Amino acid sequence: MESATHISIMPKIDGYDIVSIGEEAFANCTSLQSVTIPASVTEIGSAAFYGCTALTKVTVPDAVTKIEQGTFFSCTALTDLTLGKDTTEIGDMAFGYCTSLETVTLPDTVETLGDQLFYYCTALDEVQIPEKVTELGGYTFYGCMSLKSFTVPKNLENIGAMSFVACPSLETIAVEDGNTKYQAVDNVLYDTEESILYLYPAGRTDTSFTLPESTLVVYAGAFFAAGNLQQINFDEKLQYIGEMAFDFCSGLTSLTIPKAVTTIGTTAFADCTGLTSVTFSGASDEDGGEGGDLEIGDYAFFCDDNLKEVQLPKRVSSVGKYAFGCTSPADDDDSEDYVTVSSDSGDNLKVKALDGFLLIGYTGAASDYVKDCDVKISFKAMNVNWKAVMLWGILAVVLVAVLLIAIRLIRRNMMTAEEKKALQEAEAEHKIPLSQRGKQDEAAEEKPEYDDGYRSILDDDDEDEAEEVADYEQTISHSQLHHIGHADMPAAEDEKKDKEDEKDEK
């Protein structure tokens, strides 16, 4: 069956009516170009024609009231689709990746539309939502590159998150009269109070936009890929910036986050490659400013490759993973200076530190982000806990003192008796005034032995005797002079004695 190009399903087999086409019945029949479904069929299973990439035309019988999940998913050649007039429900991704589908007519009987209904229908440029539909699922028109306009029906009460993300051609948004939930002001979609901005069409040519004073919330994906936008002005009352709100706004060059903002969602400003300046109002206020705690989501400023410095306010209570100073290496980047992480979609993502980036903030959430990040990010602290620094300093001094005392005691216990005696003498010497230390040494000297001058009568060496007598006389004279205060010392002897005394004092 995989090679069949045209299939006509018989209405009966062996006398039994064909009422159902099972799940994945024709899945991945890549040669199938057309199929004829009999009127007796009331049910078509999920993914029944999944991956029929050559299928160009399908007519669904009126008796089929529900199109199941993924029924025509990835029928990339499908251009002509007719649904039964009694259809009431269409499941998730029923027409996802039907990249050739340009127009779809949904019967007025339809009441329920699933999530991602027209996911990446890149050729779809026009579709009307039936009046009975009250809710649009999330990501309904995600990736509809050719969609130029959309009208919100009067009974629509809820537009799912990211419903118009990646619709770069969308220029016009309108709301039918009688809708009590939404309004369009200058082709921008708000709630009736203008407190929530739901959608700024990405195809607008404006280079700047100012939010109304009444706007408190920027909805998820509201400005996604608004490539012409270079400047966004937030009112000081703004409180919430949703997930992917400004993702891929590559023209943005600078922005200021008001003090009142308490949440910046995941990837809110990711891939803003032109962004060079981000200012958080009150970032330099050490008291935290007037706003409440600020939570910054994962990847909030990821891949903002020209953003080199950000100063965070003290009121930041949490910073998500890879929110600042991180990027994804280019495909031709041969360096291994990156980490591989699992993204929310389950895919592996390479992350590396952004060269030259500096995060400035306070100890707490900001410093914890840098400490816990898998890649190395430069950080400058705005505050220092001086009490903690002083306490640690005192403890360090005490520890050093205790350590020195312990070392001294250990060394004393290891000394020999001679070393201990020498140490005691040195300590005693240290207690004597400097002016008295030399005199104490002189007093302690042993007096020379007295020689009565008698010589052996057998010694007849005159020269030796003369030398001995000279020594004797000098010894007597020197000894006597010590006792009488140098009274009778000749001049030469005085000079010699002075030199010796100076030497002793030294």
Language-model region placement:
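Short acidic DE-rich linear segments
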Residues: D498-K506
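Short, aromatic/basic amphipathic alpha-helical patches
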Residues: A365-V375
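Juxtamembrane/start-of-transmembrane alpha-helix segments at the extracytoplasmic/lumenal side
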Residues: M382-A396
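Alpha-helical transmembrane segments
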Residues: V400-L409
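Cytoplasmic C-terminal tails of single-pass
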Residues: M414-H482, H486-M489
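Consensus positions within tandem repeat domains that build extended binding/scaffold surfaces
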Residues: G22-A25, G45-Y50, E68-F73, G91-G96, ...
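Structural signature of tandem-repeat unit edges
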Residues: S3-V19, T30-E43, T53-K66, T76-E89, ...
